[in-house]
Structures are given as structure tokens and as C-alpha cells.
Design a protein with these regions (language model features):
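Alpha/beta enzyme core
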Residues: 2-66, 72-100, 111-130
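Short, flexible loop segments at boundaries between secondary-structure elements
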Residues: 103-107
Length: 130
């Protein structure tokens, strides 16, 4: 379920929307479509992680999470993964429970992988399909 967090205005509203979505049966909650700013931010994602954690403690049901929009670099993605591990634990470090909704991120991940192999960065155009 997409919450469009940029429209919710407060962390309390975000927490409530997350809880309502999970209680209504959502098996995955997503920050936004990525079209409305702000989209995924660290504080917004933490509020959602904490709501998921508390829901799991209460019900035993694992809910997935997808931060979308605004995550552009591999370094930013790593920060989200660390926060996920620290808040929800290893069980959520799987595509069944956590995914990035960030198309721009893919190019940076590819550039980082090429740099590891070739010791040189490539432009995003290097990865474009013909």
C-alpha cells in the first residue's frame, strides 16, 4: 500500500497511516510513488520501520517495506539497509520484505560495481540499452 508520505505532514500522521494500512491487511507498505516531495527520507523510513516492528511484536506478522523516491546512491542505500537491520533485524534483509523503489539508484550501483572491477567510473550512459 502506498502511503504518499509527503502529503501526511507529521510523523504522527505517518505512524497512524502505517498502522491503519497494516491493520487493514497490507502486506507491504511503500513511502510514496516518488512523484511527491519529500518522498523517502531517513526519518520517514524510520517511523515506518518502527511501526512495522511494533506491529510484528503485537501480531507476529511480518510486513514488508519499500522506500521509494529520493534514494540515488549506493551509499544512501547502505544507510537504509543499516537502519533496517538495526530496527527490524536480519529477517527483513530479503527482497520478500524490503525493496528499494529507486530507479536512479540502479545506475549508481552499476557504476560502483564497474569501479570495483576496473578501478574506473563509467557514466550512466555506459549502461543505457541501445
Amino acid at each position: 500500500m502506498i502511503l504518499e508520505t509527503g502529503e501526511l505532514q507529521t510523523y504522527d500522521n505517518l505512524r497512524l497511516a502505517s498502522e491503519i494500512a497494516m491493520r487493514a491487511g497490507a502486506d507491504f507498505i511503500k513511502t510514496s510513488t516518488g512523484k511527491i516531495s519529500p518522498a523517502a527520507t531517513m526519518p520517514v523510513t524510520l517511523v515506518m520501520f518502527e511501526a512495522i516492528r511494533d506491529f510484528f511484536y503485537e501480531t507476529g506478522i511480518r510486513i514488508g517495506m519499500k522506500p521509494a523516491g529520493g534514494i540515488r546512491t549506493a551509499k544512501e542505500a547502505l544507510a537504509y539497509l543499516v537502519m533496517l537491520k538495526e530496527t527490524l533485524g536480519d529477517a527483513w534483509l530479503t527482497p520478500a520484505l524490503f525493496r528499494f523503489g529507486a530507479s536512479t539508484l540502479l545506475n549508481d550501483v552499476l557504476m560502483q560495481l564497474v569501479k570495483m572491477v576496473d578501478a574506473n567510473y563509467q557514466s550512466a550512459d555506459y549502461f543505457a540499452l541501445p
